[in-house]
């Protein structure tokens, strides 16, 4: 059977060649016969069946020399198709017809069923100014039609890749129809593939909802639709729902791209593959090889070698390809596992003579070094330079001949050790040698020499070694000061060329520049330097000491100049986003324009923003978002040696290689920038050279200067400075294609929580930050005493536990929450009349139907008023949960779903409907969509009419006065561009609360939904806070007092629940435990995460010295605002003082680690704290997680049968708060059943626990439930059958398996005194004691 198949393919290939030749000779009346994968309709049209296609993408237009290698490798894996990237010449080098013919011929010869050809230059049209339109792509297809004709059975024409971004994507429908018509009019009969808008992910459902009309626009009905699945498709339900929407209508669909992770989120790749197979649709991964470094994880193979798959490639090969296709024979590949780091070896350095000076760097040898800095703190106990070695020559090089030198100062003589945690060439093939200079030179008294064993092999021309992860330290873990190290570049956190890391072949310097005062390495010798013998160091990792970014080294002040430079190749557009002259944050947003006639590599460009520091402090800068990628933007603070007019500093903005080429006439798109001082003290912008207060929209600002290769080409430096060197004539640069064929990030699928970001460059927009501290060492966890005394008294401390503390903003899979909140940034701009909302800074200020999409509301259902709220509340009713719904108070809501709202469309404009709290007219159940107003009283009345009053069984119980008003100017500048004032917030809160209480007196009013501590403290530096604060120490107390006064005047309580958000700022190893550290499981972060809940309640867990952390968590709040800690007692004291009877809600919170046991421990602790300390309502923010679910269910369903923790808190105390918190409860006033939550959060210390219970009944037995590090499944773990006198003891050994690699096993035995031993792995125990 297999032989017959081969013969048939051979003759079909011959026949295809004949048909192709006949077409070239213009011989008419030839009937094209269908081949494998094709079918012929009655009218002779060949329609390719895409349902059985499985393949990957090949980035041909950037790797034209890899065609044969790539296609053969792809076919060898058994894939039967490939999607090939072409260019029409608009952005990249045009792929000529002859080359396309070769692609087709080679693909046929390899036995592919069909191939897809696509034009990549359309990517992101409408949003990316460098992209071309579909109409321009059609012209290319016409140009190469001659080589496509006759291949209708084999070639699918993918008109253009991801032909719209997120701007103007509503035009996609007509543009696509017009492109199809143009191709058919030109005589194309091929199967045409149509890519979705929204960077291919169709989160707006534009393609889905218009697919039928698109199909009908094709006279041949020979179309297939292509969806790209990345972060938008992060759950199985979203994947299946989208696929079924096409399958159910009989419309052909292909998944043209997908990955296992991406910059925009975590796709559910398992569901994508499963449903593609189940519903029989074509499937193509991204991509074979050649992705840029920041998305290098999407490569299927290493170095184009099919026998060297990456983890992503191996997964796809095993799970997607499997045995579904007949592959070309290939050897079996066994993936090499990532090595577990071994203990760091100690190496004693050997002094060598100090070399003599040299001035010329060597940068033209056969190799070069790419460097990425993985330790950005200048003061640190561990230096982390990650490297790649590139063969830039024309012949292979044996890596054993290569050495690299990293130059630094030791800052205190000690033995040192180095290790490679992982290397693509094999960590065991990397060697280290510490070399001490006989005397110090500039920036170094040591270098670390990195070498390679013979096992590292040959490095081929144009290739690199792949990543080499390395770190080194001193034996006593004392600190280095990297700030003065020759080789350290603080801002280069992604790979780039660092000429201060030098490279040698046979000992001869071939790359980089040694420190001043050093000579090139001596002539080569035949004997390589031996690797020293090493001895292991102890298997401990101390907590690193970290400090803030130091003040930069002063540079000489230049001399005067009067003439600006404005005739260069680039210019700068500037928009001022902080109009207050006195501010703690400067916000210059920029665009760089190529005003020349040739392209320019952005890595050659720097921009300087000149200003006065107004009080010397360490400073930090961040790009919240940039169209070229925020991670591609770098910052450097430069201090002048003496002040000049308008400046004593400048911030230098640079660009990494990933920013790519800037084409003539194009701009970079928006670059959002902000910077601040470490103590958040104010700048006075009024005297700053570069600040133009009134220029809030983009315009030319010649006082923001620009440079190419350090030469001033735009603008005027401050008076008293000299310009950069005079510019020479501009050199025409031939564009080098940046190999970034991956999709531009797409929107996240859940509303982004309001966060307080750290000053590191990120790719996702974030709101205004709160202060980042000068960080001091993380306090060491104290050894636990030999016996932890737990005392429980069921007759004391009885308080009711609110059932509403177990709530969520996003339901956790496997948990039935008792309370639910409809909130977040999306709700500020939600229009209940049409169900549209605006994303604000979270996603391009897009107005769309995202909320409907995320809830599965479509078609006519999406047009029903308040459909989003109804879907939310009906789910709450189904689960008997409390609903808290956000009302709109910022002033405007989305009027349309047309995508991005530009700055010049800021409200008021025709993109917005104005919010009014009272209609002052009869309320309607059919709101007027054309009156330009949205009424809150009409909204509430609609909900009451549908579900009843709050006092009824089905009514909505709580209404929230909008979301995080302290950040409106940051999160929603198109709605509320100016900072909210204290006066405005109170006036709006009072007015809207009166509306609620008038319509539904029993409904609870939540306010003011503050985002975090600086919102508590000063309403995020509200412009009028200092004028209104009086004797109040923080805004919370003033707000409570004002709401109490208004309530007394109105005659009804206007604030039932003080609503706050809390995301801990605690850090371990300078990584925050949530957000950027969400998935971090290093020892430092795990300890910090498990201890972080103490800031909520523990008065001993804080520093005693302002500005210096002597105790408590490592956070800027503890460092500078410890008087306000712990949070819950401080807030409740002010409630009692200023508005007694007000309840407390924490309606957003998260502690990270949702899929790690440390996250489960922290969350279980937090829920216990909420119950014990009287929080009324709480809702976690964040995606589902296995250990997050376990933490909730230990309270809500600990036995899997619906059994719950009690509803009355009783006294429970521990002698060791640091290591073992405890919570206890009973049901009502009946203490015949006692529930105990016992948490062991000690990382590695032996514990013995004695539990002593005071109660009227005598307990005789107990059941133990819990979850462990092996599995988040909560389960029964044992029984205690003979408790005597209400006392029993547990013996808890220290954690097992803690090694230098910092992995956690949480192995614990529980020993009952009465000679009964129950062994299990756990870190959290739930016990139910019974009489």
From Swiss-Prot:
Chain intervals for the UniProt region annotation (Catalytic (endoglucanase)): 781-1331
Biased composition (Low complexity): 323-335, 721-735
Reactions catalysed, as given in the entry: Random hydrolysis of (1->4)-beta-D-mannosidic linkages in mannans, galactomannans and glucomannans; Endohydrolysis of (1->4)-beta-D-glucosidic linkages in cellulose, lichenin and cereal beta-D-glucans
EC code: 3.2.1.78, 3.2.1.4
Gene3D superfamilies (alphabetical): Endoglucanase-like, Glycosidases, Golgi alpha-mannosidase II
Domain CBM3: 363-516, 566-719
Ranges of biased composition (kind: Pro residues): 521-541, 551-561, 736-756, 766-780
Gene Ontology biological-process annotations: cellulose catabolic process
Keyword Hydrolase tagged: yes
Description of pH dependence: Optimum pH is 6.
Residues annotated as the enzyme's active site: 162 (proton donor), 257 (nucleophile)
Temperature curve summary: Optimum temperature is 80 degrees Celsius.
Cited SUPFAM superfamilies: (Trans)glycosidases (SSF51445), Carbohydrate-binding domain (SSF49384)
Keywords noted in UniProt: Carbohydrate metabolism, Cellulose degradation, Glycosidase, Hydrolase, Multifunctional enzyme, Polysaccharide degradation, Repeat, Signal
GO MF assignments: cellulase activity; cellulose binding; mannan endo-1,4-beta-mannosidase activity
Residue segments, region Catalytic (mannanase): 42-325
Pfam families xrefs: CBM_3, Cellulase, Glyco_hydro_44
SMART domains for the chain: CBM_3
Residue numbers spanned by region Disordered: 319-363, 515-566, 717-780
Signal sequence coordinates: 1-41
The family this protein is said to belong to: In the N-terminal section; belongs to the glycosyl hydrolase 5 (cellulase A) family. In the C-terminal section; belongs to the glycosyl hydrolase 44 (cellulase J) family.
Function statement: Degradation of hemicelluloses, the second most abundant polysaccharides in nature. Contains two catalytic domains with mannanase and endoglucanase activities.
Name assigned to this protein: Beta-mannanase/endoglucanase A
Organism classification: Bacteria, Bacillati, Bacillota, Bacillota incertae sedis, Caldicellulosiruptorales
């Amino acid at each position: 059977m297999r032989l017959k198949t081969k013969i048939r393919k051979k003759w079909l290939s011959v026949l295809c060649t004949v048909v192709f030749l006949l077409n070239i000779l213009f011989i008419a009346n030839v009937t094209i016969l269908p081949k494998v994968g094709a079918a012929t309709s009655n009218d002779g049209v060949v329609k390719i069946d895409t349902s059985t296609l499985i393949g990957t993408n090949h980035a041909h237009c950037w790797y034209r020399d890899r065609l044969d290698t790539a296609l053969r490798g792809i076919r060898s894996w058994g894939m039967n198709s490939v999607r090939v990237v072409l260019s029409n010449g608009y952005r990249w080098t045009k792929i000529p017809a002859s080359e396309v013919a070769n692609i087709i011929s080679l693909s046929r010869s390899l036995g592919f069923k069909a191939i897809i050809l696509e034009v990549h230059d359309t990517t992101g049209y409408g949003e990316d100014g460098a992209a071309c339109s579909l109409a321009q792509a059609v012209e290319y297809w016409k140009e190469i039609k001659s080589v496509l004709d006759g291949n209708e059975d084999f070639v699918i024409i993918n008109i253009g890749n991801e032909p719209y971004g997120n701007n103007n994507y509503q035009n996609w429908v007509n543009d696509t129809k017009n492109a199809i018509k143009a191709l058919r009019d030109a005589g194309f009969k091929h199967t045409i593939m149509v890519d979705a808008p929204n960077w291919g992910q169709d989160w707006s459902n534009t393609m889905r909802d218009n697919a039928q009309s698109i199909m009908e626009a094709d006279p041949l009905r020979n179309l297939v639709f292509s969806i790209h699945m990345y972060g938008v498709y992060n759950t199985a339900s979203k994947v299946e729902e989208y696929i079924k929407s096409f399958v159910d209508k009989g419309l052909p669909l292909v998944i043209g791209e997908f990955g296992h992770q991406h910059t925009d989120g975590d796709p559910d790749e398992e569901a994508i593959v499963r449903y593609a197979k189940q519903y029989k649709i074509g499937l193509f991964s991204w991509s074979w090889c050649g992705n840029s470094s920041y998305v290098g994880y999407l490569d299927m193979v290493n170095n184009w070698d099919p026998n060297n798959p990456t983890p992503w490639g191996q997964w796809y090969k095993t799970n997607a390809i499997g045995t579904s296709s007949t592959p070309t024979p290939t050897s079996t590949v066994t993936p090499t596992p990532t090595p577990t780091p071994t203990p760091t070896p100690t190496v004693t350095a050997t002094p060598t003579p100090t070399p003599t000076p040299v001035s010329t760097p060597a940068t033209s040898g056969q190799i070069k070094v790419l460097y990425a800095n993985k330790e950005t703190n200048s003061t640190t106990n561990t230096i982390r330079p990650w490297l790649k070695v590139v063969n830039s020559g024309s012949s292979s090089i044996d890596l054993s001949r290569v050495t690299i030198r990293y130059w630094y100062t030791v800052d205190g003589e000690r033995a040192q050790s180095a290790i490679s945690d992982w290397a693509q060439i094999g960590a065991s093939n990397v060697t280290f040698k510490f070399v001490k200079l006989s005397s110090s030179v500039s920036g170094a008294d040591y270098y670390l020499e990195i070498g390679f064993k013979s096992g590292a092999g040959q490095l081929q021309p144009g290739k690199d070694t792949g990543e080499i992860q390395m770190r080194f330290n001193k034996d006593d873990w004392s600190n280095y000061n990297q700030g003065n190290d020759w080789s350290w570049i603080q801002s280069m956190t992604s790979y780039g060329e660092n000429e201060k890391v030098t490279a040698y072949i046979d000992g001869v310097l071939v790359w980089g520049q040694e420190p001043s005062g050093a000579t090139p390495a001596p002539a080569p010798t035949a004997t390589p330097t031996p690797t020293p013998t090493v001895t292991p160091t102890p298997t401990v990792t101390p907590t690193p000491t970290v400090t803030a970014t130091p003040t930069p080294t002063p540079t000489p002040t230049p001399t005067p100049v009067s003439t600006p430079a404005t005739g260069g190749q680039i210019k700068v557009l500037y928009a001022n986003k902080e109009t207050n002259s006195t501010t703690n944050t400067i916000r210059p947003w920029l665009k760089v324009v190529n005003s020349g006639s040739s392209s320019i590599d952005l890595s050659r460009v720097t921009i300087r923003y000149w200003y006065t520091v107004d009080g010397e402090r360490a400073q930090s800068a961040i790009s919240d978002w940039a169209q070229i990628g925020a991670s591609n933007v770098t910052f450097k603070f430069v201090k002048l040696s003496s002040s000049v007019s308008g400046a004593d500093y400048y911030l230098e903005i640079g660009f990494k290689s990933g920013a790519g080429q800037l084409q003539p006439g194009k701009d970079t798109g928006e670059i959002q920038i902000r910077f601040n001082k470490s103590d958040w003290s104010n700048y006075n912008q009024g005297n700053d050279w570069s600040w133009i207060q009134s220029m809030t929209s983009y315009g030319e600002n010649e006082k923001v200067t620009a440079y190419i290769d350090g030469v001033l080409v735009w603008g005027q430096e401050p008076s008293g400075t000299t310009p950069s060197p005079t510019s020479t004539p501009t050199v025409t640069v031939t564009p080098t294609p940046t190999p970034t064929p991956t999709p531009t990030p797409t929107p996240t699928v859940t509303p982004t929580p309001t966060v307080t970001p750290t000053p590191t460059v990120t790719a996702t927009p974030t709101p205004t930050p709160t202060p980042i501290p000068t960080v001091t060492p993380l306090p060491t966890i104290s050894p636990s005493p030999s016996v932890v005394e737990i005392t429980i008294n069921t007759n004391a401390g009885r308080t009711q536990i609110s059932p509403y503390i177990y709530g969520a903003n996003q339901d956790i899979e496997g948990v039935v929450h008792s309370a639910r909140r409809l909130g977040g940034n999306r709700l500020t701009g939600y229009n209940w009349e049409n169900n549209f909302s605006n994303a604000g800074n979270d996603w391009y200020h897009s107005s769309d139907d995202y909320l409907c999409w995320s809830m599965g509301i479509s078609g006519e259902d999406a047009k029903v008023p308040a459909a989003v709220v109804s879907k939310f509340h009906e789910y709450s009713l189904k689960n008997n949960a409390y609903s808290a719904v956000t009302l709109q108070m910022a002033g405007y809501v989305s009027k349309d779903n047309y995508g991005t709202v530009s700055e010049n469309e800021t409200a008021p404009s025709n993109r917005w409907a104005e919010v009014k709290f009272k209609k002052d007219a009869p309320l309607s159940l059919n709101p007027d969509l054309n009156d330009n107003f949205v009424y809150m009283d009409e909204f509430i009345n609609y909900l009451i009419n549908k579900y009843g009053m709050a006092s009824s069984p089905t009514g909505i119980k709580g209404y929230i006065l909008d979301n995080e008003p302290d950040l409106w100017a940051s999160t929603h500048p198109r709605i509320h561009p100016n900072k909210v004032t204290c006066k405005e917030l109170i006036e709006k809160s009072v007015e809207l609360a009166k509306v609620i209480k008038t319509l539904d007196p029993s409904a609870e009013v939540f306010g003011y939904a503050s985002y975090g501590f600086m919102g508590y403290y000063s309403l995020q530096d509200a412009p009028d806070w200092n004028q209104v604060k009086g004797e109040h120490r923080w805004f919370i107390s003033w707000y409570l007092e004002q709401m109490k006064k208004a309530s007394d005047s109105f005659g009804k309580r206007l604030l039932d629940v003080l609503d706050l958000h809390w995301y801990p700022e605690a850090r371990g190893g300078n990584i925050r435990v949530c957000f950027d550290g969400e998935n971090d499981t290093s020892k430092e972060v795990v300890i910090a995460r498990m201890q972080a809940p103490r800031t909520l309640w523990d008065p001993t867990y804080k520093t005693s010295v302002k500005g210096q952390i002597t105790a408590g968590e490592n956070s800027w709040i503890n460092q500078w605002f410890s008087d306000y800690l712990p949070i819950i007692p401080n807030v409740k004291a002010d409630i009692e003082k200023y508005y007694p009877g007000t309840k407390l809600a924490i309606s957003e919170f998260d502690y990270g680690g949702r899929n790690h046991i440390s996250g489960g421990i922290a969350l279980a602790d937090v829920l216990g704290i909420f119950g014990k300390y009287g929080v009324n309502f709480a809702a976690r923010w964040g995606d589902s997680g296995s250990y997050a679910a376990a933490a909730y269910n230990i309270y809500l369903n600990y036995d899997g049968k619906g059994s719950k923790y009690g509803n009355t808190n009783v006294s429970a105390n521990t002698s060791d708060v640091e290591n073992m918190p405890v919570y206890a409860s009973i049901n009502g006033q009946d203490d015949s059943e006692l529930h105990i939550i016992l948490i062991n959060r000690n990382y590695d210390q032996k514990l013995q626990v004695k539990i002593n219970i005071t109660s009227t009944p005598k307990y005789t037995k107990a059941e133990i439930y819990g979850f462990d590090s092996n599995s988040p499944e909560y389960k029964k773990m044992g029984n205690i059958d003979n408790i005597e006198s209400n006392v029993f003891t547990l013996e808890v050994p220290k954690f097992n398996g803690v090694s230098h690699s910092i992995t956690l096993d949480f192995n614990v035995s529980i020993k009952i005194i009465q000679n009964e031993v129950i062994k299990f792995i756990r870190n959290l125990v739930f016990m139910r004691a019974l009489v």
